[in-house]
């Protein structure tokens, strides 16, 4: 059994992060899509099929599959009562020792899960393709500090601007998800300008802000993942695993077979 799977099933304090590919080619087969969709609760199925674009449907489906798979592993039960906070952050009712956060990216979805008493966590995926030209910098001026704006503006080429912006954005959204407010929060309240984006081939970059530990890493050349948790739990050393959608689907099917 892999380290992350053993940890997720254990009762010991831990933090596990799972990232899953959004396998568009697999879901071009209508049978594969419908089979995976039927694994979800009916209410979730309705939310998935309400999406207009096929890619958005697939992303929503993958998000829910990963949420179901991860939370069932952690809580060792099929009977999970999910609900949402005021600003839409999902959580599990009637549990104080488990929390999680979800994010959708361009080609991936991710979840961070913490088996810790009354502990918030946050996570976000950001793509360099969200920043298409140097002119975009002006559009995002309201969410960047003066120092962040200048650092991006001073990059020597567009690709470096895109990567730095994606890094800043992922940290900011991760933090607001940690707070449970998402995009309803003020993205300027956290200033990331003192930190550099991790290198593409770097395993993980770790830094602290506001007594919170952040981990950032590129999951592809285009997408960066950032997740966070209270700095007091640094000793836990979170485990991050990248899964494929087929293994998650099979995992859901067989989770509680005897």
From Swiss-Prot:
GO terms, molecular function: holo-[acyl-carrier-protein] synthase activity; magnesium ion binding
InterPro entries: 4-PPantetheinyl_Trfase_dom, 4-PPantetheinyl_Trfase_dom_sf, P-Pant_transferase_sf
Top EC group: transferase
Keywords of the record: Transferase
Pfam families: ACPS (PF01648)
Gene Ontology annotations of biological process type: lysine biosynthetic process via aminoadipic acid
Entry protein name: L-aminoadipate-semialdehyde dehydrogenase-phosphopantetheinyl transferase
Species of provenance: Candida glabrata (strain ATCC 2001 / BCRC 20586 / JCM 3761 / NBRC 0622 / NRRL Y-65 / CBS 138) (Yeast)
Lineage: Eukaryota, Fungi, Dikarya, Ascomycota, Saccharomycotina
This protein's encoding gene: LYS5
